[in-house]
């Protein structure tokens, strides 16, 4: 029931209000969509939860730079991510004189036996070698975390949760150095 054109402004206010609640014992906030006065919030979190914002729109990048700790894009094509996504985020950070937020993408994992040779290939789709290269590129771009999304929207695939778990085990065995929190050489 939220008007489409108001979603961004509402999200901005909710994020700002959360930060007030997390950083004050007695919190007040007065906005267009959220308002509260003298709310006792204790005990406050010992560590303020990090806020990750997704999306590729200009508004999402502004929201990330101004209100979040990390940018969380999903379903990324590495070529576009390198030449468009990350540079745009840097430009927005410079425009607002803010530090560059962490970059923590979610990649849809789909391990194949053979390489996928397509300009439209998503990061995380392809052979183990391609996925290793994707992760190395993300590391070079300064990504702090990478989430592997194994959720398969294709319900015609039997045992799709089992397949996702198998992909994660394979990555852990052959691509990732879990103890070192890095990628195997």
Enumerate the language-model features and the residues they cover.
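Active-site-adjacent structural elements that line small-molecule/cofactor binding pockets in enzymes
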Residues: 1-185
